[in-house]
Amino acid sequence: MAAARGRRDGAGRAKIRSIHPMSRLFRDVEGGLLCPRGSVVCIGAFDGLHLGHRALVRHTVARARALGLPAVALSFEPLPREFFAAANPPPRLLLPRGRVEGLLGLGVDHLGLLRFDAAFAAMPAEAFVRQVLVGRLGAREVWIGPEFRFGHRRGGDLALLQAMGAELGFSAAQIAPVEAAGGRVSSTRIREALRAGDFATAAALLGRPYTIGGRVVRGRQLGRTLGYPTANLRFPKVPALSGIYATWVHGVGERPWPSVSSFGTRPTVEGVEPLLEAHLFDFAGDLYGRHIEVEFVARLRDEEKFPDLPALIRQMHLDAQQARHILSESERLRATA
């Protein structure tokens, strides 16, 4: 997917053109009526696109199809919690590209990935309803998840939507909470599971295995020097992981490729920026520039600083052996499931 390109209007405000070839993705809150016949809209952060998010989006799409109207999902970039905690943002469950592709893949006709900046944060909830939901999208129905809030100081909720809808000609409702793995599905629970290395619970809440995708970039090639060449992924947003993992890499061949991966700053070699490094077992190809997905199966250990490179190499041998064993057992269980 091509990167968004920005330009400035006469007032110096950033204007973002659609970055989807079918013009299904928009970033601006200004502009003409996008859905002249009306629309069915859902709103949320959608970080992770977990089972609760998917239930909300699928319900919105079903309602839109029943009414013969376009389905619209509204979200934000950066996420509001990232904007308000810029110095220490919560870790991402799903990177921007994955969120866009996931939402469009659920069948929405338009996706609003609205730029969350200081001006947007200061917009009163009432103005958001009038300007965006009605003025931009012609909303006929608005759907939200449990406890969703919007607008300046989180002043908008379901009651406000319903009151303004009665005035402006749309209905508003929320879907029921989704339960899985012994409790309510939430992004917080998923982050806790990932931090604990509990990928089974994370997968149960997400409705799929936890993966991180990105384009393979050139690193310092230290892994090759140490006998463990890696496919390196950098991220604009820090995922909710840190440590050494048994992983599958998708996008290399017809089947997932067994691998051992490290996410962190590589303290033994004085690394600084977070980097995901995936060593694919018995692989000899060139992956530079290719988009791959790394599926996390098990957490092996914390990232740590070793006294010297020989000590690091010895541990890498142990990590690789453990990852091979875990993945072999995982593959056996899949085959008999």
Predicted regions, residues:
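N-terminal catalytic cores of NTP/NDP-binding nucleotidyl/phosphoryl-transfer enzymes
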Residues: 32-95, 101
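Compositionally biased, low-complexity flexible segments
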Residues: 1-14
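Phosphate/ribose-recognition catalytic cores of enzymes acting on nucleotide-derived substrates
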Residues: 219-337
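Residue-level signal for inorganic ion chemistry
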Residues: 50, 103, 142, 202, ...
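N-terminal Rossmann-like or analogous alpha/beta NTP/dinucleotide-binding catalytic cores
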Residues: 82-168
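Positively charged, low-complexity intrinsically disordered leader regions
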Residues: 15-43
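Glycine-rich, Lys/Arg-enriched anion-binding loops that position phosphate/diphosphate groups
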Residues: 162-265, 337
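A short acidic, helix-capping loop that chelates divalent metal ions and anchors anionic groups
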Residues: 80-86, 184-185, 304-305
